[in-house]
Every structure is written in C-alpha cells, then in structure tokens.
Amino acid sequence: MIITFCGHSNCLFSDEEKEKLKQLLIKEIRKNPTFKFYLGGYGDFDILCLRTLRELKTDFREIELLFITPYIDKNYSKLEFAKYHYDDVIFPPLESVPRKFAILKRNEWMVEEADLVIAYIKYSWGGAAKTLEYAKRKKKHIVNIAK
C-alpha cells in the first residue's frame, strides 16, 4: 500500500491540524504496517509530513519513507538531504519530460501509484491544487486535512 501527499508549499499549521495528520497516519499504519510513503520534499506540508512520519517510524519501523525525485540529475541538491532523511530515493520514469514540467509529472506519477492521497489544500490555485484535481479525476481516495 502506498500513501502520498499534496499540499501548499507555504502555510502555517495549527496544533489541531498537526494532530489530525498524526492521528490519520497512525490509523492508516495500523491497518497496514508495511505502508510506503511517497514524499516530494517540497514546501511546508511535505516537511510536516516527513517530520511526523519520522517520529512515527520509531514505533512503526516497517513503514518506508521514500523521496520521489523529479530530476535524475545527480547534482540535484535535495538528493543529498534525501539520503539522510528518507529510506530510499525513487526516480520515476520522467526521462523524456522537459525540466519545467518535471515536478508536475512527478506529482501525477505519485498520485497514480498511490492508494491514498493525504492533502492540505485550502484554495483552488497552484501546483498542489492541480495535483488534488488530478487525484480526483483518477478517482483516488483522498483525505484533505485542511477541511
């Protein structure tokens, strides 16, 4: 089972929203302790998800935290960070995608692979909102913790 995330890159979270995310993740992990979590590593919501999952990994060691990179470039700065904060790095099949579309196509790939999309979407514009709309078109199970 795979869970992925989409959320606004710049936002502040209430303690209630942070706890809501944590409790949702615990509930899902208890259903299937071998979940894989696909994370994009961009913005505030991705950072919150990574921090929460790393905290939960102390109790649920079987979960995998996977950084899904939009770029194959070995000099991509986030790859070095990913080596220390994720269990592995995945390069989706994006070799033929122009660099300016790589993040969008990576997000779509993550949605296609996922069984559940956990979102933090408060408004209808931007890349995160586009990813959420894509997940809806693909009829993915979605939980938006911003509501």
Label the predicted regions.
Residues 1-147:
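Acidic/glycine-enriched connector segments
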